[in-house]
Amino acid sequence: MAVTFAGQPVTLKGETKHPGDKAPDFKAIDRDLNTRALDEFLGERFTVISVVPSIDTGVCDYQTKHFNKTLNETDGVNVVTVSNDLPFAQARWCASAGLEDIVTLSDHRDLDFAHNYGTLMEEHRLQARAVFVLDSNKKIVHVEYVDEVTEHPDYDAVIKLLKA
């Protein structure tokens, strides 16, 4: 899979996922520095894992706000945002955005998520932009690795799937 960052090819490390795959477990750090696991965030129907390079960039900011605000009232759907930002940066962003109740997880320590989902941009030690939708049995039903990391994912495809 060819992915670019600001027009330059990057190497993705880890195991690429596809629809039908079982979502691998992972551990990441929450804003209170607690180690958390995927099973803690599974929705009754679906879980959206929104992966961003850095919460402090415009596209990542929009992606995080858009998925959380749009899907907030969709029954049985949980949204989790994963980045390599430090938990303190995620907490600051959530407070400034007025979104203290959303779930953000930092993969900065062990890169466990990145290795399990194939999102590590080796050259930058950042996550590639991606979206994974899991059903309640942890089966991946939608995957998007965004070809150009500085671009937006296909929000409509995810929202259409979840609101059907």
Question: Where is each model-derived feature located?
Answer:
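Chalcogenol-based redox active-site neighborhoods
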Residues: 1-164
